[in-house]
């Protein structure tokens, strides 16, 4: 799965790709060709202090 800052091009890679939102993150899933999976956003800073 790729981590991308923008999913605009990722959703147009294949006609079966669809965007879903799970647990506050946006994913592109493609059941017919799983190599097109992608997620938007990076890691959060958890150890602020």
UniProtKB/Swiss-Prot annotation:
A GO molecular function term, named singly, is: structural constituent of ribosome
Single Gene Ontology BP term? translation
Name the Pfam families on file: Ribosomal_L36 (PF00444)
Question: What keywords tag this UniProt record?
Answer: Ribonucleoprotein, Ribosomal protein
GO CC list: ribonucleoprotein complex; ribosome
Q: Which domain of life is it from?
A: Bacteria
Q: Which HAMAP family match?
A: Ribosomal_bL36 (MF_00251)
- Family the entry assigns: Belongs to the bacterial ribosomal protein bL36 family.
PANTHER family listed in its UniProt record? 50S RIBOSOMAL PROTEIN L36 2, LARGE RIBOSOMAL SUBUNIT PROTEIN BL36B
Protein name (database record): Large ribosomal subunit protein bL36
């Amino acid at each position: 799965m790729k981590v991308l800052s923008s999913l605009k091009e990722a959703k147009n890679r294949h006609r079966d790709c669809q965007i879903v939102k799970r647990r506050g993150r946006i994913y592109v899933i493609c059941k017919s060709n799983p190599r097109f999976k992608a997620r938007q956003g990076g890691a959060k800073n958890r150890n602020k202090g």
